[in-house]
Amino acid sequence: MVIEWGTALYQLLAFAVLLLILSKFALKPLLGVMQKRQDMINEQIDSAEQNRKEAEKLLAEQREEMQKARVEARELIENAKKAGEQQGQEMVRAAKEEAQRIHQQALAEIQNEKDQAVAALREQVASLSVLIAQKVIEKELDASEQDQLVQEYLKQASEEL
């Protein structure tokens, strides 16, 4: 095989010219398009990363808000429980006070009735004493008759009560 140097040199020169033309007219625009595409992909990656960070931030904020809402709900429940307990205790206290008042009123009424009964009994004893004194004056009695007479009048007085 014989190498023809003239043809090889011509082909090498044609290849170099073609490479120069391609690099000037085709390769630069092609590299520009590829660079634009790479820039666009990098922008999309940056945008996606920024969106991811923003989503994580929003998620953290939502979790924080959710936690605050849970704490608030717990506080509301605790406050409602405390208010219910206080209201229950207040109702029990009011009921005890009312029972005490009714008890005191009943004791006062009982004392009043007792005082009235004692006063009535004193009046009856006084009138019986007057009657006994009249009977004694009317007739002289010995001790046994006097005891019998007092017993009769006491029996009569207890029946009237």
Curated annotation (Swiss-Prot):
SUPFAM superfamilies: F1F0 ATP synthase subunit B, membrane domain. GO terms for cellular component: plasma membrane; proton-transporting ATP synthase complex. GO terms for molecular function: proton-transporting ATP synthase activity, rotational mechanism; proton-transporting ATPase activity, rotational mechanism. It is a single-pass membrane protein. It is found in: Cell membrane. The chain crosses the membrane at residues 2-22. Keywords: ATP synthesis, Cell membrane, CF(0), Hydrogen ion transport, Ion transport, Membrane, Transmembrane, Transmembrane helix, Transport. It comes from the Bacteria. Its main location: membrane. It holds the Pfam family ATP-synt_B. F(1)F(0) ATP synthase produces ATP from ADP in the presence of a proton or sodium gradient. F-type ATPases consist of two structural domains, F(1) containing the extramembraneous catalytic core and F(0) containing the membrane proton channel, linked together by a central stalk and a peripheral stalk. During catalysis, ATP synthesis in the catalytic domain of F(1) is coupled via a rotary mechanism of the central stalk subunits to proton translocation. Component of the F(0) channel, it forms part of the peripheral stalk, linking F(1) to F(0). Belongs to the ATPase B chain family. F-type ATPases have 2 components, F(1) - the catalytic core - and F(0) - the membrane proton channel. F(1) has five subunits: alpha(3), beta(3), gamma(1), delta(1), epsilon(1). F(0) has three main subunits: a(1), b(2) and c(10-14). The alpha and beta chains form an alternating ring which encloses part of the gamma chain. F(1) is attached to F(0) by a central stalk formed by the gamma and epsilon chains, while a peripheral stalk is formed by the delta and b chains. This is ATP synthase subunit b. The lineage of its organism: Bacteria, Bacillati, Bacillota, Bacilli, Bacillales.
